[in-house]
Amino acid sequence: DAYSIACKEGADMLAFPEMFLTGYQTQDLVQKSAFVEDAQSKLIEFAKECSDGPTIGIGVPLQDGDKVYNAYAILQNGKIITQIRKHHLPNYKVFDEKRVFDSGEIHGPYVVNGVRIGSPICEDAWFPDVCETLEETGAEILISPNGSPYYRGKFDKRISLMVSRAVENNLPMAYLNLVGGQDDQVFDGGSFVINSDGALALQMPLFEENIETITFKRTQDGWVAQEGKKASYPDHWEQDYHVMVLALRDYMKKTGFKKALLGMSGGIDSALVAAIACDALGSENVRLVMLPSKYTSQNSLDDAANCANLLKAKIQTIPISDSFNSVLKTLEPIFEGLDEDTTEENIQSRLRGLLLMGLSNKFNEMLLTTGNKSEVSVGYSTIYGDMAGGFNPIKDLYKVRVFETSRWRNNNYFSWMKGSRGEVIPNEIIQKPPTAELRNDQKDSDSLPDYEILDGILEMLMDNDASVADCVVAGYELSDVKHVEKLLYLSEYKRFQSAPGTRLSLKAFWLDRRYPIANKWRDNK
């Protein structure tokens, strides 16, 4: 473990990231005194167990009277010598720290073997004042513990900000980040060390738990980090896919599930989720289920079977036609004289949800949902039907990116993937027009603009908070924009009841975007 390695290496200090002892984010759990007291009790035990080794820095919640702090505890000789309290509390996007924590005063440096160390906690290093104060009070090295979750492009922003802090204060900095999934968020690791001139001395890999030793040498110009390992930096396609795999793997582990199942439609969304599930859990732990109706084409049946074969995952078929007819017969006296509409379509979807949840309960397998961000945005899904499930790996992936990600996966394989090499999503699935197959000759484009147009409008309206007028200026038809806007707002109630899913962007559904369910405002300018 990390402590044993640090002792073996003769390290002066073993540094862990922010809130490492409890995980991050703990949300309102830190408002429970029993939780914080338990964390502090474990911290005391940990300090005693590690009394003969190096100084340890570790993130932990701290209660002081009626105040609760996001703290960084420094352990030496079996004792807690200080607990640094986070000063800047983020209160935007997924962060609600002002709701659950109190702001601490800026803390001065602590001493490790005669060297003065300053530890700005995460957000404290995003602004100049804390690091500046640490430098002015004698800090010689900065060690910044972080719980920084992934979004596309986040790593580049971290590097840029930390280079600024190092150069501004003429101090080397070690940036430590958590690794792993917590609900919808993934902490992507990628810890690094930079010198006072902004040069990178060490880069740890993204998405992997790792332990590295870094040596600092004193020079006439101050301490300098010696050159260490520099992990390669994956492109954004690999990062996104790895995040979806890690999010599912950790969510399953932390909620006690070892196996997953999902409904296969023969379409691209379920095929991609199946690939992610196999890469996260291994194909032997994934059950695929085809639930055909009279509207399901033979091509869909063949494509689903072919995909399962490429993934080396078992697939089972449960026809729903008899169940569907039985429900219609039961409702016939009440529906008499009424035309068929989306009611009958939704009954099919809910029957599938019913059967899949039955399998989930019986075999203790987590049911995965497969709605992409485009569908989740406009409510192109059936509540208590295909929305039924425990986790959605592609919830923050627009449809156009679903196609691109599927092509990427077919052409790429890495050691962290537990699934099959090579093509895992048949080209026939990627090429065919999307359809829900809930009525004859149905296509998604019957109800929605083409996905290139839909995704473009959604990115403006939702991701960038653009106005309807902005969308029209960008070249989109007013009728399309108003239609998408209407669906976006009307679908809020569905999203409140949807499964959690991997956060990939700066505007994912849940904590990044909080809208009322009942509100009639529309952008009519």
Could you describe each region identified by the protein language model?
Residues 1-263, 274-285, 290, 315:
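Enzyme catalytic cores with a strong preference for nitrogen-chemistry domains
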Residues 170, 196, 223-266, 270-525:
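ATP/NTP-dependent adenylation/nucleotidyl-transfer catalytic domains that generate, transfer
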